[in-house]
Amino acid sequence: MKKALLLLLAICLMASCSDPNIQYVKKAVRIMDRNGIYAQSSEWEKAKAVALAAKPSSLEEAQEIVAQAGKVAGGKHTFLMTADDMTENDTTAWEMPTVELLEGGIAAIRLPQFMGNSEDGIKYANTVLNALPNTLQSVIIDLRGNRGGNMYPMIAAVHRFLPDDIILQLRTRRNNMKINVEYVMNVAGVARQASIDCPVALLTDEWTGSSSEAILLCFRGLTNARTFGAPTAGYASCNQPFSLPEGSQLVLTTGEDVARTGEVFCDDPIAPDVLTETPLEAALEWINDNVK
C-alpha cells in the first residue's frame, strides 16, 4: 500500500513537472520574483503562492494567472503580450511624428506613441531630425495622446534640445542605469546632430504615459524648459520584456524613473508647470516672453 502511494505521488510529480501550462506559470513567477519592482513585498509572497499552487488546464488559464501575478510583482504598468499580440504589434503601421515650422522660428513637434521595430525607430527619429533647421528661436514638443512604447527613438528625435549630461536614470532593485544622449543615439541607431539651445515647451495630457513621461523627465530641471497641460497618466516606470513559451512576452515593471533633479517617479501622475486647458496657447505665450 505504501509503495503504491509513493508511486502515485511520483507519477503526480512527474505530470506536474511535464505539464507545459504549469511550467509556463513557474517560469513567469521566477522572472517576476527576481526582477519585479514590488516582488519583495508580503503581497507578492501571497500572490506567488497562489500562482504556484494553481493547476491551469490550458495556455489561456496559465496566461491569466501570470497576468494577475504580474500586477502584484510589477504593478499597474506590467502586462502580458500573447503571441497574437506580438504579431499584431509587429505588423502595425505606427504613426510617424510631425514637424511644423511656425512663424518666429518656432518648431512644433508632435511625438506619437511608438512600439515598432528598429528600422521604423530610425525612420521615426529621422522624420523629426531631417525636418529641423539648424537654428530655432524655440520648440514645442507635443506629447499629448502619447501612451509610450520605445523611448529611444522618441528621445533621439528631440535629442538636439537636450544637454550633454545624464538626462535620465532608471533605478531597479539591483542597478541604477544612467542614460545620456550618446547612449540613446547608439541604442536608437541614429546619427547625433548639433545641439540647438532654445526655450522648450512640452505639452501633456492625461494620456501622456510611460515612455512619453520619460521624455518629459529628460527635460525636467532645465531652466529653459517648461511643461503645459494636464497631469500625466502616471506610468513613469521602466519596463523590461521577458520571453515566455508559446511566443508570448511578459513586460514587467522593473524600476523607477529618476530625473536629473533627483526626484523619483513611478506610479503617480506628473503635474505640469502650468495647468491649463489650452496648453498650446499658454506655451506660445511663454515662448514669446522668453525668446532671446
Located regions from the model:
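Sec-dependent N-terminal signal peptides
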Residues: 4-14
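Terminal peptide-recognition signature
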Residues: 28, 69, 109, 141, ...
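STAS-typified acidic loop motif
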Residues: 97-122
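Short acidic catalytic loops
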Residues: 109-110, 131-148, 202-203
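A short, well-ordered alpha-helical element
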Residues: 117-137
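Gly/Ser/Thr-rich loop/hinge elements
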Residues: 148-201, 237-243, 254-258, 264-265
